[in-house]
Amino acid sequence: MDNVLPVDSDLFPNISTNTSEPNQFVQPAWQIVLWAAAYTVIVVTSVVGNVVVMWIILAHKRMRTVTNYFLVNLAFAEASMAAFNTVVNFTYAVHNEWYYGLFYCKFHNFFPIAAVFASIYSMTAVAFDRYMAIIHPLQPRLSATATKVVICVIWVLALLLAFPQGYYSTTETMPGRVVCMIEWPSHPDKIYEKVYHICVTVLIYFLPLLVIGYAYTVVGITLWASEIPGDSSDRYHEQVSAKRKVVKMMIVVVCTFAICWLPFHIFFLLPYINPDLYLKKFIQQVYLAIMWLAMSSTMYNPIIYCCLNDRFRLGFKHAFRCCPFISAADYEGLEMKSTRYFQTQGSVYKVSRLETTISTVVGAHEEDPEEGPKATPSSLDLTSNGSSRSNSKTVTESSSFYSNMLS
């Protein structure tokens, strides 16, 4: 892998650096039109969908939870990559010529790595948050401020990882065209290039997916393998069901990312195994297809949220209410019904003590996509992915639930 969008120096570096021909990869106009339509779908769907996701969360107070702040970061990274890189990737891959100057060459090689890093580690943060909420429900949860700090740290690390590729990017004039390339420091075995590519692949793909896989495996075993006590109230059944729905949704999001990006990483590791592969005439079409699949990962999450989460579905219906084929939705499902909005477990606990009951931390930040507004909002607050917050459960009920869930 020469980088994360576009390919180092040219679509096919082994050819572009060793030939005097202007461009050996020219395809018929009808193919270009088809590919242009396919890439346009990505840009429009991703930008519009992710902007709506950010609006749904940030414009509605009850949607501002720890999990959803990370989803905002994920949506921002994906919308930005779709807007700033997809079209440029497509035109460069089709024409094999760089039209955008030195600055954008550096940005184009720099930003996608940072965006993908921010995306996958936002998913990792959500997995960690779900893990702590379900496996260690008594532990303190992240506050809104701490969540924002984590997001800033993610972006700082993302920019640091992407910096070398942006720094060494440059443009070069070849016979009849200009190409955008990465000039790594000279070394007989290209050791700097290889080490960097391997590190990037591990850090933005394999490592976070392993961490996420472990977290959701443990969470899944806890949620699905445990029996809910028969004498438990409907509230507990609803809370466990809510947790399961959120975990299912995030597993779909992560699996979609993994499937979309796996062929891309394999494609760019193959030159180290079979350098002659890039000499094949069909490789341009293969690259366009693999790149389309990778970039399409930016447009699926809004669709997943809309399909699997009632709150997001209400938000999308409201955002597109002007469309004749969109039925009117109960928009109040996104609004704050209760004036008692608790951001942390500590505040829930303190209020519960004043009410002479003991607050349960189960579900303190859990999302319940299927929950609707309750008749008694003073004792129940619903959050984003449907988080249901029970502010007054007895010690007996809580202990019974914990012992069963953690057994």
Swiss-Prot record:
The chain crosses the membrane at residues 32-54, 65-86, 107-128, 149-169, 195-219, 249-270, 284-308. A lipid is attached at residue 322 (S-palmitoyl cysteine). InterPro entries: GPCR_Rhodpsn, GPCR_Rhodpsn_7TM, Neurokn_rcpt, NK1_rcpt. This is Substance-P receptor. It comes from Cavia porcellus. Residues 55-64, 129-148, 220-248, 309-407 are cytoplasmic. Coiled coil: none annotated. GO terms for molecular function: substance P receptor activity. Residues 376-407 have a biased composition (Polar residues). Keywords: Cell membrane, Disulfide bond, G-protein coupled receptor, Glycoprotein, Lipoprotein, Membrane, Palmitate, Receptor, Transducer, Transmembrane, Transmembrane helix. Pfam families: 7tm_1. Belongs to the G-protein coupled receptor 1 family. One of its GO terms (biological process) is positive regulation of flagellated sperm motility. Residues 363-407 are annotated as: Disordered. Residues 1-31, 87-106, 170-194, 271-283 are extracellular. Glycans are attached at residues 14, 18.
